[in-house]
Amino acid sequence: MSASNSGENPYTHVQFDTSVGTFVVELYYRHAPRTCCNMAALAESGYYDGTIFHRIIRDFMVQGGDPTGTGRGGESIYGGKFADEITRNLKHTGAGIVSMANSGPNTNGSQFFVTLKSTPFLDGKHTIFGRIYSGMGVVQRMGMTPTDDEDRPRSPITIHQARPFRGPPPPKPQQGAAALGAGQAHARITAS
């Protein structure tokens, strides 16, 4: 299996090249190691390649990771579903938080979502396992995509390729001062 599951240094980020641009997810191994290993291994295997963001709710979140594109599919590297890794130290405090989509407790598979604003009502219900490191503008554009009455994008947004990587990420693109605070947030980590 990949180094992400063999005890070596885990992958630290996953880069998603989509039909509307590229974004990079920083993985929170310290808080959600099994969830991070799941995403990294799925990305490394090409599982996400060619899938779509099947659910977009403006001013809330964008959701993908289902190979069926229906919102009902997807499996983990662990064979089916796996348990939540919810910690009270991580909160959905703003745009750019990456969490597992689920259909109830301990039903994580391959689907994930990225928040477009603070969503505290999700705290304790969804495993937070990362944040958008770069490309939040791409995610925000995704969030503005017109959708039908079932929150499906009218024009598909496709993941062309998702690949994990280790070590220092590539430099962030230069941004103007106005863009630096444009809704991007870190998951708040509090001492327990």
List the model feature ranges, each with a label.
Residues 1-192:
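Cyclophilin-like peptidyl-prolyl cis-trans isomerases
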